[in-house]
Amino acid sequence: MLKTILVAIFGSQNDRDIKAIQPVIEKINALEPYIKKLTDVELKEKTVEFRERLSKGETLDDVLPEAFACVREASVRTIGLRHFDVQLIGGYILHKGKIAEMKTGEGKTLVATLAAYLNALPQTGVHIVTVNDYLAKRDKEWMGVVYEKLGLTVGNVGNETKNEERRMAYNCDITYITNNEIGFDYLRDNMVIAKDDRVLRPLNYAIIDEVDSILIDEARTPLIISGACAESTDKYYISDRIVPRLKGRIITENEEIKAKYADVDLAKGYDYLIDEKNHSAVLTEQGVQKAEKMLGVKNIYDDLQSEWVHHLTQAIKAHNLYRRDIEYVVKDGKVIIVDEFTGRLMPGRRWSDGLHQSIEVKENLKIADENQTLATITFQNFFRMYKKIAGMTGTATTESEEFWEIYKLGVIEVPTNNPMIRKDYHDVIYRTEREKDNAVVNEIESLWKKGQPVLVGTRSIEKSEKISTMLRIKGIPHQVLNAKYHELEAQIIAGAGTKSAVTIATNMAGRGTDILLGAGDAVQNEEVKKSGGLHIIGTERHESRRIDNQLRGRSGRQGDPGSSKFFLSMEDELMRLFGSDKMSVIMQKLGLKENEDIQHLWISKAVENAQKKVEGMNFDIRKRLIDFDNVMNKQREAVYKLRNEILEGQDITDTIKDMISESIEEKITAWAVGKYTEEWDWASIDVWLLRTFGIKYETGNKDEISNLSRESARSAISGKVFEAYEHRKEQLTPELMLNMQRIVLLQMIDSSWRDHLYELDQLRHDIGFRAYAQKDPKVEYQKESFALFESMMNRVRDNTIEYIFKVQIDAKLQKMAIQTTNSDFRKNDGKKINKGSNKIGRNDQCPCGSGKKFKKCCGA
């Protein structure tokens, strides 16, 4: 109550933020008459002037008013669009590294030109990131002429863009790109052997279109570059045959709570339990015993048989949680994932941890190879590497807490240019899905007859096809949009506002394309407005309020009339899993007849509360994901930093010598144990020296060293080894030796990092079981992943040393080394890597990701 009174008196924080920007907008508007008088040449020369001012110490904020005024004028002269004041506000918010929430149709694409131009002036690159290739290409072609009018270069990177073209596009002042393409380019850049194969510049500033979709919806799925992993597929087939013979039970949250208070064992009489809400499966004690008997093993949880638990659990999930034509489709003999947020097919994407293979077996398809991760990163950690990011979307307020907590991005809601007059009706709820579907079709028929356009949003391809079939039976013409082709998708969605148009779309198919009433025809536009504008029908509530708001937002753009209504049933997934028991009881007590519905604010509120509950759960999942990925991120940064130093052509001789000294120290410490030298393990030292460095001691030499102290012995061995190193250098020539070292070290880093990622995958899969031992899985993961990382770095060191002394330089390697010498080393004047040792100093930050010093964390 107090908060409401304070807002009424002082305005909301958002109102105050907008008010604070107004003086800047007034400055921009005051400059408009002056900028209008400039010739095209003078307008273009403004860019040169701004860059000179920046070089003399002015800031981007200093040149912002004039720069924005120039962009506005360039837009008028090229594409005939003048930025409204609210769009200038949006551009200012983007420049300040925040999220501008702008309703559908408010011109977000045009808004981006303001901040993009300003931040491109320092010539460090601006990326405008969007969700698909079609939008990236369309926006580059549409807005590119504005930038070119001002003397900037513009590029676009798509799925088919070749390497050299990518490099050129990224070297442009402004680059239009999808989130997937730039993420994969970053990973690929950190896998190359030659510096010239990299395509990206350092990450400077990104404007993320549909920022909620990229930073939240897709945050649970990491980008992964993978390769085939040789593994037997027998266990998938055996597990698939066992699961149908097991008895399972799907449990709801309410059942779980009631069972807990009543002390009832839900697992009794069942072999496995399915938690549909959390998308998880677990074998019961009875199920474990039955599975062990069928498999003929004593204990499926011991080290040798533990993979059986994993394979059986994945098979259970494949049979119970993943449904054909909802979570995936089968096309051309392949299982193709359906994006749960957009309904789009995602060819080439695969579920990990063997789940995809389990589904392939379930569908009697040829099983594909298990994938091994070669490089991976989450969008959370990727976009946090930019110096500055900003975002645009029509729906960000509901996720403002997450944007701030994960990305430190504030959200400011930009006022609409014209008042919003769309009417949003209360939800209507039916007992069964059948009754709800009938009501949806009847509503469509009624609106179609009066000429009002209708956009029907569904959550799955299956649901789209079901509604489509019912409309065909009634003879109602319509378009079905299952989001398979982005360009076709845009064309269909653009026509969804024409008279009597009926369009069925999965979730946010066609997002990014405006729906114009009458499709731009003035006469038809008036007719459609008189009929009530575009009517939105939601056939089910999504887990996230934001997705529902996105659907609603397709109607009522730029002050147009419109309306929206959601149709629900007690059989909908959200209601079934998260709806309260009270709602079910009320529905029963009301004694509703066939096809009767309830409409009430209380019901809409109950649904919203259920959605808030799911949003909270999903937020926790994403936070857990980033907690674990932060551990890997510190290690990834360390490895990629070393890789880049090597690629930059810096002299790594000191690094190699440090590795050799470290290795000698480690071996002497391990084998020179005992008070007397006679007690030392000379046999192991001999074998190691011969195997690694090709050094063979004669008996006399050994006797001589045996009489020395440990320090003297270490010094003597080091002398022999470095003598052999210098001899190796003379054999090859210093230039060839230098570049052979670089090539070998890169290959050792890559192969060891690949193995390390596999080990981390396994660790992460198993770490959850530590909770049963009253241990925090996150803390355990930090400690063990650090131990694995240190072990990996030791492997890199030992393998690199051995290869340097043993590798045979064939013609191909020699040519490669010489080319590297000419192109890299001489260009960089033989700079040395500032690196003393592979070991972590006690006062260094711990690579586990805790943020603590090593001595206070894993090194304690």
Swiss-Prot record:
The first-level EC class reads translocase
Write out the catalysed reaction: ATP + H2O + cellular proteinSide 1 = ADP + phosphate + cellular proteinSide 2
Concerning Pfam families, the annotation shows: P-loop_SecA, SEC-C, SecA_DEAD, SecA_PP_bind, SecA_SW
State the needed cofactors, names only: Zn(2+)
- Taxonomically, which superkingdom? Bacteria
- Could you give the cofactor binding note from the entry? May bind 1 zinc ion per subunit.
The UniProt entry's coiled-coil ranges are none
Stretch forming the signal peptide: none
Ordered alphabetically, the record's keywords are:
ATP-binding, Cell membrane, Cytoplasm, Membrane, Metal-binding, Nucleotide-binding, Protein transport, Translocase, Translocation, Transport, Zinc
Residues at which ATP binds: 87, 105-109, 514
| Main localization of the protein described in the UniProt heading | membrane
Q: How does it sit in the membrane?
A: Peripheral membrane protein
Compartments reported by the entry: Cell membrane; Cytoplasm
Q: Which BP terms in the Gene Ontology apply to this protein?
A: intracellular protein transmembrane transport; protein import; protein targeting; protein transport by the Sec complex
What Enzyme Commission number(s) apply to this enzyme?
A: 7.4.2.8
Q: Which GO terms describe its molecular function?
A: ATP binding; metal ion binding; protein-exporting ATPase activity
Cellular component per GO, a single term: cytosol
Whom does it interact with, and what assembly results? Monomer and homodimer. Part of the essential Sec protein translocation apparatus which comprises SecA, SecYEG and auxiliary proteins SecDF. Other proteins may also be involved.
What is the similarity comment for this entry? Belongs to the SecA family.
Please give the function described in this protein's UniProt entry. Part of the Sec protein translocase complex. Interacts with the SecYEG preprotein conducting channel. Has a central role in coupling the hydrolysis of ATP to the transfer of proteins into and across the cell membrane, serving as an ATP-driven molecular motor driving the stepwise translocation of polypeptide chains across the membrane.
Mind telling me which NCBIfam families this protein's record contains? PRK09200.1 (NF006630), PRK12904.1 (NF009538), secA (TIGR00963)
Per its record, how is this protein called by name?
Answer: Protein translocase subunit SecA
Name of the encoding gene: secA
